[in-house]
Regions:
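Internal alpha-helical scaffold of NAD(P)-dependent oxidoreductase catalytic cores
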Residues: 41, 93-102, 118-152, 163-202, ...
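A short glycine-threonine-serine/GTX helix/turn-capping micro-motif
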Residues: 154-162, 209
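Glycine/small-residue-rich loop that forms an oxyanion/phosphate-binding "nest" at active or ligand-binding sites
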Residues: 50-53, 58-127
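NAD(P)+-binding Rossmann beta1-loop-alpha1 motif at the extreme N-terminus of oxidoreductases
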Residues: 1-50, 58, 116, 174-177
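Residues at the starts of beta-strands that form the adenosine-phosphate
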Residues: 2, 24-26, 81, 102, ...
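Non-catalytic terminal and connector segments of soluble metabolic enzymes
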Residues: 6, 14, 47-52, 60, ...
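NAD(P)-dependent Rossmann-like dehydrogenase/reductase catalytic/cofactor-binding core
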Residues: 187-190, 194-248
Length: 248
């Protein structure tokens, strides 16, 4: 299968990097100089956006959400399937601006580059198996039953990596504050996140916490400080705020 990626920003290229070993890719964008660079790197066909014919193509739309209308005006023909990774852009909006036989919304994240994305999706049910096959090439996939659910999931699936960078940076800064060299603080924190992934995949967060929290110990003291600073509440509110933005 050939997949046509429209949009060559960070998300589009992260997805492309994850898919390149399994699919034939072609790229469409406004920036012709960037397209030439991509052509050399991926040995792929490239096309300017203006008047690009999407007839019978399987499209991965990875432009900025605000550009949906203007990009749609540049395209002609009717796509076979439109896979959109535009946060907050509804299926109705997509189908209004881009002619397609079928459409699926996906919310991946930039970890797609490392085949470790969390991709939440919804759309035409008959395209579910195909969508899961394509996006399983870049990580885990989760099909949900409504657009509201994918908008909620955006707060974690899409924005989650940025939220976790706050945690990672704060941990690094804490180690440096207490006297550790920055490279060591960075390496230790990175290793912690690497080891935590398989741990959280097979254990409930509360069980992990309880297993390492000793009475009067270091973990209990640190955890109490986070609760005092309303970190848990702030994260819950952050998810809510991200969801609100998708509804605008």
């Amino acid at each position: 299968m050939t997949l046509t990626i429209i949009g060559t920003g960070s998300m589009g290229m992260a997805i492309a990097h994850g898919l390149k070993e399994r699919y034939t890719l072609e790229f469409v964008a406004r920036d012709l100089s960037k397209l030439e660079t991509i052509k050399n790197e991926y040995q792929a066909n490239i096309y300017p956006l203006e008047n690009f014919d999407i007839t019978n193509k399987n499209i991965i739309l990875a432009v900025k959400p605000y550009a949906l209308e203007s990009v749609g005006k540049q395209l002609k023909g009717r796509a076979n399937t439109l896979y959109s990774v535009l946060a907050g852009s509804s299926l109705d909006a997509l189908n209004t601006h881009i002619a397609t036989q079928s459409s699926v919304r996906i919310m991946p994240n930039v970890s797609a580059k490392f085949k470790a994305s969390t991709s939440v999706m919804t759309g035409d049910e008959h395209k579910r198996a195909e969508a899961e096959e394509i996006f399983s090439a870049i990580g885990d996939t989760f099909w949900v039953g409504s657009e509201k659910e994918i908008d909620i999931a955006t707060a974690i699936a899409g924005s989650g990596p940025a939220l976790l960078t706050l945690v990672a940076e704060a941990m690094m800064d804490g180690l440096v504050k207490e006297g550790m060299k920055r490279p060591d603080a960075t390496g230790i924190t990175n290793s912690l996140f690497k080891g935590f992934a398989p741990l959280i995949a097979s254990n409930h967060p509360a069980l992990i916490k309880d297993s390492v929290m000793s009475p009067g110990g270091t973990t209990a003291a640190a955890y109490a400080m986070l609760e005092e600073g309303a970190v848990r509440s702030s994260f819950i509110k952050a998810v809510g705020e991200a969801f609100k933005v998708t509804q605008k």
